[in-house]
Swiss-Prot record:
SUPFAM superfamilies in alphabetical order: Translation initiation factor IF3, C-terminal domain, Translation initiation factor IF3, N-terminal domain
Source taxonomy: Bacteria, Bacillati, Bacillota, Bacilli, Lactobacillales
A GO molecular-function annotation: translation initiation factor activity
GO BP: any one term: ribosome disassembly
Alphabetized PROSITE patterns for the sequence: IF3 (PS00938)
Gene: infC
Entry keywords, A to Z: Cytoplasm, Initiation factor, Protein biosynthesis
Annotated HAMAP family: IF_3
Protein name, per record: Translation initiation factor IF-3
Pfam families reported for this sequence: IF3_C, IF3_N
GO CC annotation, single: cytosol
Function: IF-3 binds to the 30S ribosomal subunit and shifts the equilibrium between 70S ribosomes and their 50S and 30S subunits in favor of the free subunits, thus enhancing the availability of 30S subunits on which protein synthesis initiation begins.
Length: 173
């Protein structure tokens, strides 16, 4: 059951007739608004409209304050469980040396193990743009070296004077 910030409660309900549900979930039938309010007040609870679009609208007898608190608690828990995925960038060059490549590879692996995506980019300077295949080989090697912990989300593609490759961590769940 989702909660709207402006749920109609007690006197805020405009419908004349309501299908009433008791606090323990049993159907109490169709009642007038006055009867439903009287039943709710006698139990020291609130009358909350839960399905305004139904014919007749459905109202439930409950402790509205407690209900709001529980819903907010659920929303907070759901927000805590959400994982924010960051995209980290590793910049390479087409003429990268072996040790430099290994350092960049180590950084990329570290990001992937943390659960972040990795965007590997190669910037071509000057006339190096004529040898795109060299940059392609560097990115392919990076994808190959991280194949055990990552999948290629976006294959290497040119964008202006740069070539990009996106890697996403594999889900082992």
């Amino acid at each position: 059951m989702t909660i709207a910030k402006d749920m109609m409660v007690n006197d805020g309900i405009r419908a004349r007739e309501l299908r009433l549900i008791g606090q323990d979930g049993e159907q109490l039938g169709v009642k007038t608004k006055a009867e439903a309010l009287q039943i709710a007040e006698s139990a020291n609870l609130d009358l909350v409209l839960v399905a305004p679009g139904a014919k007749p609208p459905v109202a439930r007898i409950m402790d509205y304050g407690k209900f709001r608190f529980e819903q907010q608690k659920k929303e907070r828990e759901a927000r805590k469980k959400q994982k924010v995925i960051n995209v980290k960038e590793v910049r390479l060059s087409p003429t990268i040396d072996v040790n430099d490549f290994n350092t960049k590879l180590r950084n990329a692996r570290k990001f992937l193990e943390k659960g972040d995506k990795v965007k590997a980019s190669i910037r071509f300077k000057g006339r190096a743009i004529t040898h795109k295949e060299i940059g392609q080989k560097v990115l392919d090697r990076l994808a190959e070296e991280t194949a055990d912990i990552a999948t290629v989300e976006q294959k290497a593609k040119m964008d202006g004077r740069s070539m990009f490759l996106t890697l996403a961590p594999k889900n082992d769940k």
